[in-house]
Amino acid sequence: MAITYNNLYLDIRQRLRAAGIESATLEARELVCFGTNKSREELARDGGLYASPELEHRVRDLVRRHLEGEPVAYLIGEWEFYGLPLDISRDVLIPRPETAELVELIVEESPNARRLLDIGTGSGCIAISLDKKLPDAKVEAWDISEEALAIARKNNDALEARVRFLQRDVLADDWEKIPSFDVIVSNPPYVTETEKNEMDANVLEWEPGLALFVPDEDPLRFYNRIARLGSELLLPGGKLYFEINQAYGRETAHILEMNQYRDARVIKDIFGKDRIVTANR
């Protein structure tokens, strides 16, 4: 029996809700739009029209794959972050709302920053968002992964941003360091190996481990390194911003204090969890 686009969307939303998916409304819309080759506006406009059996089958196959664990962002190859449409692949993490809070904080606190550095850029979501919100600033972004940088540069071009992307291993120490940044931001790997057991299977099986995990015996390795690096790269009065593992808020702030940063703060995210640490140089 033929089904309208709107009823197809409602049916998919109900299936996702029944599966316990909190963001069922958003995910149903994205899957139906992608599966039927319609924009959100076109889906709303054509809601009363009938979908062809081929399109309905395509949408339901996408839903099946999602219910088996494949994230929507990887199914459709894109995800929205801070109002920007980003290409996404399994080479990068799926941008999350907590990270958008980090961008918003930087924009609010450092609107006059002229040079910003994003370490571990992944899809480029932080760097590109900052570039778009702070048009007078110059943004640089680093990642160790060639594949991630390819995605980031693609997003940079598509969104007509001006971020300078470099392949760089932040744990290495093989380049000249000149104080030149007003802001350094990083959302580095921070999930311990032990915490794997607490993670959703769709994250473990699909998202890149290189961007997620750190060894149990050295869970703050990136924060220690970037704090020291920031002391060399930040201009006087510059600011350092971290997204963190909620279990290590106080410890991360202590690292900054031990590296002579001032006014270290631990900030909770929209879910009430310690998620951001920031301090002044």
Functional labels for PLM-detected ranges:
Residues 9, 28-29, 59-60, 69-72, ...:
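A general structural signal for well-ordered alpha-helical segments in protein cores
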